[in-house]
C-alpha cells in the first residue's frame, strides 16, 4: 500500500510539474490553477562512534528525513499530498518513525461563506488549550486529523468550525492494536465589534470564543490492567493486597474552552479558561482527575515601547487521543499549552530549555518590557538603542495534604468524585521548575557595525524537567554578537558566549563566525567547549568519574540559488534537547557529515 501511495505521489508530482510547465507555456485552461510545492531533505552520514561525547554506535550509516509536498489550487479548489521518507530517520526520532509513504493528503473546496476539507488537516481552537493540530518536523510532531473539517461564516462577525477525524499516530490513523480513536470538535467565534458601530468607531475590538472537543478512545482501551494496590485488605495482616487490578478507562473524554479577547487602542487583553473531564492515561499515571487551565495575558504597545504580562495555571491538561501513548513521546496530543518562557536562539542560552509540565501542572508567569531609546539622546546615541528585559517564573502546584486521599479502589472508578490529590487554586508549591531573567541590548554603532549583548540568569529544575537526579542548576550566561558589513555583498557575523554554573557540567564556552557572500554563499564555523564532559562506556552507560575536555566543532557551507538551498558540513554535537514552544525532543550526541537541501516553488 505504501509503495502504491508513494508511486502515485511521484506520478502526481510529475503530472503537476508538467501542468506547471504548460501554464507557463500559455495554455489557457491551465492558467486557472496554481501549483506550489516543496522538497526538504536532511541527511546525516559517515557517522562515527566517540565515547568522549557518548555517541553510541549507530546501525545506520546513512540517515535522512525527506519530505516532498505538492499543492494545487485555484479560487474554489485546493488539493495536496505529502510524501515522507524516514526509513532511516535522523538521531532522536524513535523507531516508530521508520517508514515511508504518503501519510498526508487532502482536498478542499470553498464557495462564498463555506469551506470544506476532506482528508488530513491542521487547525486550532483559541490558544490551543483543548485543540491544536500542527506539524513541527524538527520535533517529530505531526498530529493532524484525517477526516472532515467544515468552516462557515454565515453572518457578519460569526465564524464556525466543525471537524472530526482520526489522529495521526506515527504512520497509523486507526486499527492499531485494535484501537481506533475518533476526535470531534466545534468552535464558535463572535466578533462583537462588527455588530456594535460605536465599538468600531472607538477602535475597540472584542472577540468571544466557545469551543468543545470530544475524544472517543476506542474499545481496546476501555479497560487496562495494572500491577499495584488492588484496593482490598488482607484480613489476617490488615495490609493492602498487591496484584493486578483493572482500570475502567472512560470511552469518551470531553473538553471545553471559553475565551475573550479585548483590544482597545494600544491595549490588548486575553482571558481563556479550559476544562477537561476525567482522563486517566500514561501521562498522568492513570489517575481520575479533571483538567483545568486558566490563562491571562495583557499587553501595551506604542512606537518605541511595548509591555507584556502573562499568567497561567494549568492542572492535568495532557489531552491525548490514546491513553496508553508513551509519556516520553510527543505523539497524539490533541491540545497544546503555550509556553510561558522565552525561546532563546543563542546556543548557550538554550542549553537548559524548559518543557511545559502538562501533568500534574504548573503556575507560570512571564513579563517583558521593550524600549527604544531615541536617536541623538544620551542612551540612544547616533542611531538609537533597543533594550528588552524578559522575566519568566514557573513553579509547581501546591496541594492540600489534608485532602489527599489514600489510593483505594474508588480512585479507579471513573465516576468517583474522589481524587488522589487536591490542588487549591491559588496555592503554589515551594518547588521552582524554571526561572529566566534576561536583558538584551541591540546597538547600531555605525552604518557598517551592529552589536548585540545579552545577560541571562536561569534556574533549571533538572529533576522535574528531565526526570534526572541532581540539584537545581543555576547559570549565568553572557552573549556578545557583532555584525560588520565590509561591502554590499560581504558581511561577517560573530558570536562569543559564556555560561557559568557550579552544577551539572560546569562552565561552557561558545564561539561562532559566519561569512555571508551575496548572493549565493555562506560559510559558518563554530566551537562549543566544555572541560567536564563525562565519559561514556562502550555499552552506552555514563561514567561520571571520568571527564574529558571536548570541543564540539561544527562547520558548514551554504549555497543558495533562487528557491534552491543546499547546506553541506561536518558536525560534532552534544546530547541535548531540541525545543520549540515548550515542547522538547531529546537528540543524542552524534558526529558525522551533514547535508540539507530545500526547494520551494
Regions picked out by a protein language model, each given a short descriptive name:
Residues 90, 94-96, 172-178, 276-289:
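Outer-membrane beta-barrel proteins
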Residues 128-137, 143, 170:
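Structural signature for solvent-exposed beta-strand/loop edge elements and short helix-capping sites
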Residues 135-137, 171-178, 244-247:
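Flexible, glycine/proline-enriched loop segments at strand-loop-helix junctions
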